Design a protein with these regions (language model features):
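Short glycine-/small-residue motifs
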Residues: 124
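Conserved catalytic core of two-component sensor histidine kinases
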Residues: 9, 16, 85
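Short, surface-exposed ligand-recognition loops at beta-strand->loop->(often short) alpha-helix junctions
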Residues: 10-13, 80
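Conserved active-site tyrosine of GNAT-family acetyltransferases
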Residues: 18-23, 91, 119
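Major-groove DNA-recognition helix of helix-turn-helix-type DNA-binding domains
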Residues: 26
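Vicinal oxygen chelate
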Residues: 1-6, 29-81, 85-115, 128-140
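Conserved beta-strand-loop-alpha-helix junction that forms the acyl-donor binding cleft
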Residues: 12-14, 106-107
Length: 140
């Protein structure tokens, strides 16, 4: 298997609410390849998909069982501590739940966490040790 992921799919409890959060709230552009029940958001090398959670579980032949923590977090790497603060303020206004307010962290950066409308955990972090290229991709 090549060292590459192309798509991250988040299961949603309320598909339209989730699409509105990302599309209208955050201003992300939905791909024209999106279809009923599947919203696709190109993120520069990887695509975020939204799909009803129950249907996603059924497709994997699993029974959907809610949990507080799935073991998965998504991360947005900000360019400054101020951007971390600004993003967390923005998503709170959009109805996201702030789980951990922005703060200095043990690894030398600055980060906070929020849950989107379906409870997916998203970190907003500034890491002074990591650089971003001209397309905002991590240089590792």
């Amino acid at each position: 298997m090549r060292q590459k992921l192309n798509l991250i799919t988040l299961g949603t409890d309320n598909f339209e609410r989730s699409v509105n959060f990302y599309e209208k709230g955050l201003g992300w552009k939905r791909s024209s390849e999106s279809v009923d029940g599947l919203a696709l958001f190109p993120l520069g090398g990887i695509t975020l998909a939204l799909h009803p959670r129950q249907e996603l579980a059924e497709d994997a032949t699993l029974q959907y069982k809610p949990t507080e923590f799935s073991g998965l977090t998504l991360s947005y790497n900000a360019k400054s501590e101020k951007e971390v603060d600004d993003v967390l303020k923005e998503v709170k206004v959009l109805g996201a739940v702030i789980i951990k307010p922005a703060q200095k962290v043990f690894w030398g950066g600055y980060s906070g966490y929020f849950k989107d409308p379906d409870g997916h955990l998203i970190e907003v972090a500034y890491n002074p040790f990591w650089k971003l290229d001209e397309n905002d991709n991590l240089i590792l």
